[in-house]
């Protein structure tokens, strides 16, 4: 078994479940993007940073047996979770590769499409990975990207001072770790440098009340992230508990409105 390469939020079973919920929230947008990118029966698609494979499973069903999904993931635990799920669905058209997108070569070429979501935001040199993925495409092949454009649009009405502070602290911590939460701002001008031509962009943001399923996406992230910030020594445990209590209070108010971080959908083709 390959050495497990962990993530900030971990690769344990709870995180696998959280990522499943996250994919269910975003699945309508994802399926629509793939359709507009002409991912269809017979396509060969790379799922870059596949995690436990929720997108890979959907892609495998779309491309059917004449197509193929190449799932690239650095966590062996996530790859094992994907293998179990694929077997349960009877899918045999998914190939998994235990690689790191930063340090390893992309083990494919001439593919029809690449799908990547919330990976570039955690990389110190995103242009290098973008170039690798572009090189794996056939001429005219497409890359579909979902990345944050403005994480600071995460907000609540009524306003909460401690939750607003949480957003600011989370962004500062993200950048201090070498990532960039608003990475789409940088990615768009990088496309030509990677041999890609922009076809389409689409901003995605939600404004929801606590009874909307989209709310669950942030509800499974914010309390855990506040605790992780405390464990890292970035904030005090007391501050983290105040964030958790404030979020619980916002959630208990049926009239609260939460706006989500702004995601930019990018579809580009290889020149």
Give the positions of each predicted feature.
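Conserved alpha-helix/loop element of class I SAM-dependent methyltransferases that forms part
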Residues: 24-44, 58
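Class I SAM-dependent methyltransferase SAM/SAH-binding core
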Residues: 46-48, 52-104
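A short glycine-rich, Lys/Arg-flanked "PGG" loop and its adjoining helix->strand segment in the class I
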Residues: 127-142
